[in-house]
């Protein structure tokens, strides 16, 4: 597919740095980018990081050096340096291509493109193939090759956006992205390659339909991943990530790939999301969140993260086992070095979760996001991963837990709230410092630094920040920490910025050199200390510092230019609304309008309530003044306890009147008054202070005058909104003061309290002098509103029993007053009930169905409709029928659920504990968790029983349990002895400890390993031998049979032997007599490839192939034998023999174990263990297979020995048998290459000869009579009417034909000869044809039809015709008429008949043959390409007829045809 690059040492960091620094920063040339890119770099897209010269193609780090975490080291050593094993053959080939063409050799500038270049092969790229990689050895690229490259890229993009795409083209694009240079990827991005890949991913559909297109999905996501090496592609990807319109979400399609059943695709999709989420700024974080919300829109997930976490848990627990990710049991499973991309996927997913939870600046939002992830399934995943002891998974998990717990503690303590307040205060202070110039420009005052030891200039501040980040990398050693502190303090006070920048460069280089260390060692710490102490001595000269400053300024300008490009690209993004700010402003205006509408509604409700409330307060104060005046002038004394009781009864009514309905009733009905001086009598005046909750609200009403007339209850209130808010926001009123108890009266009159009316107004006070008289109750407070907007009502208190009144002791006047008071109270009660029933009488569904939970409230404005029809009364619904529909269909329960107003409990941030204790070693428990993860949902007892009854259950576990040596290691089994059962004794004792107290895997280890420890290892070894023996023997058997068949073919194939004999004859011809040989060794046959001809163009193998192909074609049948040799050339004969012998030895050990080993003691086995029975039944079959394979091995070795001797290899037969097949195959490959090159060369030569002949024929043709006829056909004389009459009369006679032919011959003789250039004549002929096409059509057709009719009407006779194939007979026209014979043969030739040759007796045979050949040659060039097919034959027939017959007859025929027109 691609030629291999010249071998050489890999480039050094110095050469890469010099090469990178020489790149042009102009927009026309591409800037090379290394394979390592920082996914959290701070908006510096051109940052070059060549940290490792030997990095692979996929080395993309997940974090930058700025973070103080071990994830940077983890990325370099785990995530991408894991050996990926992909079963797909094409991907395996591209992995090899990636190793052959590493990224470092592809980071070179785009070659110069010129239109005209020289033919020097060193200055041009002439041999570019579509799939060949572009290398940096070519500095000049011709325009044609560059156009081919662009067309190839366009072709790939076309194939990508096809629906559905083709797997073959997607895989080819994947290969190109792995082997082509960076500027090739830049061209791919500029032609919308990234957008095309995202569209192709979208065109695959959604799950579960996409599940059938997993191979296509894998190729597309890999192509997107490999594009990240180009900076242009990264910018395009970042811009496209923000594309989220209805119906399409670019990142949403990638989020769907995270759910893919291919773990390799899910891994790369996670990396792509991680790449964006790690960028600074909330825009990319929001884009990733919208991608997960896209899953909810497509109904792939219930919540944003539930499907993702479910898939993540499936991978951890083994439910989702893929072809490219199934971890097989190996020897060192605890290191996880051979588990494909499983660890990559886990680490990348945990890193993506960390970035998602750390991106929001608001602590509450971060905690809410963490809570959502934990609820979606992250908690289960963490519990499972805590059992894993892989160092990379453990480090990533600990970082996640650490960040989660830190946010949880801050959320509970509320420390971040104070920080936010301080930031807000600081921002306001800075805002106040802004001053406006007279010209309107805003300037900001520069504040002095807080601390004097902090840097004051921006350069020093930048250096200080960098050094702080560097220092955090060396916190493991105290010595290096102290040294770096001193170094930092020195550089803060250093005035020379050049020295500081040079020191920073040295420290950064040291950090890059020490990246590979996992932990700080003693020698490393000492080296860092010495480096920090002697760093100033290693500073460069002033020239070096100036050079560094120049490079630094250039890099800053380049970064600025790239930032401007990013901003322009983002502003030109043609997705979504044209102006995002205008779109957001429109949404904000709509939200403000809705809020204003709600505010106006609340203000109107507040004003309405305020008006009623103040009116009631005024009425109450007036009534209170009246009652005080009456009581002061009253001569009778009331009983002290009655006023207190009446006051309490009024308070109860006050507590009940919390409904807005009662306020409406009181507005209309609460307008009664009390007449003073009704009763006469003497007594001690009593001043009663009624408890009022509104005294603090408005004290001006308490001093109002006493009026004997009713006072208006709705005075004009014109308070502002600000006063109303102050009124409502006042603190709650203080508790009422104590009631002044009057002196006891001589004749107390008990008065019954008012009847308890729910929601009604208070009853009017009785007349003075009557028991129970007192001030009216205060007005009700504002109605209480719950958190969700619905009102709650205070429960009605129990009514006190009405006290009995002895009316016999009352006077007549008192009885009248008591009766009047009762009437007034009854009227007030009736009015209150009417006001309440006005609304409660409206039918409601609550009368039929009681809500099961508190509901939210509908805030509408209630109106009293005027008399007459309206929208609610004209076409009134039947309430009973409508209510039945609601109840029968369950709509009320549905509404109860959807509009539930039950207060929600806020989530609580909890800490996750990673502490665990286990008797089982971490590595063993980790390995068992991986092996048993697909069956971990089964109970332990059932799982152990499954292993005992079905020994073949879970074959992967057999290999692990055989190699792990769990039962033979006392350190593993001794802690579990108290939990185990010993089956070696006849009466096994019960375990002393409870096995149920152990964890899942500990319990399994006890029941399956510890209980069977006396024969467990031999059992698992025998089961492993049984599971692998037949498969190994089958492979050996197939290979040995192929070797035997190939050996027989070599010895029996005659063509194979003669093939080499011809080669021997050619070699002896070349050699001198004393160098001749009767046989040659195959070991040295490769020398034929080095023997070239005199021109060094071809080898002997090329000429040998030409001889075999042309002179001995029957020897080509030996190719079937060579094909067999090619199939067995890769087999190692010694390895096959060793495999048979090893299988026999293992079988002997297995047989011994069954007879005399621990497996033979069945009485000491577990009672449910069926392993021995199954192995005993399998033993005879295994013995027979071993016997057959040993016999087959003997036959193979005998055949090989005879074949080696047959090929004249007599020395060291045991060594030669491993190589002679390879030598024969090498010879056949050389022969095949030479054969293919010969065929290609012959084909090119054939095309060249045909091209030369064609050119020579066109150039060498002379002018013919046909060209003259075509050119001069307009010059033919016009026929007279007599000739027309004669032609019409003689139409059916042969004599007329002869006359016409004679006239045609005369015209031929008078025709002009023309010039010597035939091509010019042909052009003129075509020009003459074009205007007269319509006029010439009918005459030619008339000539042909007339000729056919005349020939058919002539009597038949036989004519002998001689041809190359023999003698034939023809039946032309009349006897003796040779003209008819000639005409018919011409007609047959023009109509596609076979070529005929007339008899040699005919005197015109040679003339006719020559003229027919000339006509045939001229027929093709004379075809006008713009005319209809079939028009040429009639015109050629006319010309031939005029040439081959009498000229006069032909002229007459033409004239007659023209006259007919």
Swiss-Prot record:
Residues 845-1257 form the FH2 domain. One of its GO terms (molecular function) is small GTPase binding. Residues 92-508 form the GBD/FH3 domain. Residues 29-53, 438-457, 1445-1454 have a biased composition (Polar residues). Residues 731-784 have a biased composition (Pro residues). GO terms for cellular component: cell cortex of cell tip; cell cortex of growing cell tip; cell division site; cell tip; cytoplasm; mating projection tip; medial cortex; medial cortex septin ring. Residues 137-515 are annotated as: Interaction with tea4. Residues 801-811, 1273-1315, 1325-1337 have a biased composition (Basic and acidic residues). Residues 12-28, 700-718 have a biased composition (Low complexity). Its main location: cytoplasm. Belongs to the formin homology family. Interacts with rax2, rho3 and tea4. Interacts with tea1 in the presence of tea4. This is Formin-3.
